[in-house]
Amino acid sequence: MVAENQYYGTGRRKSSSARVFMSKNGSGNIIINKRNIDQYFGRETARMVVLQPLELFDMVSKVDVYVTVKGGGISGQAGAIRHGLTCALMKYNELLRVDLRKAGFVTRDARKVERKKVGLHKARRRPQFSKR
């Protein structure tokens, strides 16, 4: 399924999961769910998060990236794509792992939404205490 010059990585963040395919001989095209990165992410911060691993090694214009992402919101999807792209970069060249680890991209952010508990308004918000 994955071609010789393609590298695959799976990324997850919150409730989002991304499948990232990276082609090493590219021109800098980043396609997310069949749309350009500028069309898919309206927020500049989300675009910056996605491009962080590539900018670390000045590879933004050297590779093509094709992504399918589902679940969650804008921030979670951007984080999932970054994690998947990091995994794909490590398959491309294992020597990049040290710098990616130092930048904090390798570790999966395990924080998820805490569940609502019975008797509370939200996950931790208690009902107002009344002395009398």
Curated annotation (Swiss-Prot):
Any coiled-coil regions, as ranges: none
Q: Name one GO cellular component term.
A: cytosolic small ribosomal subunit
Q: Which Gene3D superfamilies match?
A: 3.30.230.10
Enumerate the Gene Ontology biological process terms. Answer: translation
Q: GO terms for molecular function, please?
A: RNA binding; structural constituent of ribosome
Task: Determine if Ribonucleoprotein is one of this entry's keywords.
Answer: yes
List UniProt keywords, sorted A-Z. Answer: Ribonucleoprotein, Ribosomal protein
Checking HAMAP family in the record gives: Ribosomal_uS9_B
Q: Which NCBIfam families does the entry link to?
A: PRK00132.1
Family, per entry: Belongs to the universal ribosomal protein uS9 family.
* Name listed for the protein in its UniProt record: Small ribosomal subunit protein uS9
Where does this protein come from, organism-wise?
Baumannia cicadellinicola subsp. Homalodisca coagulata
What is the gene name? rpsI
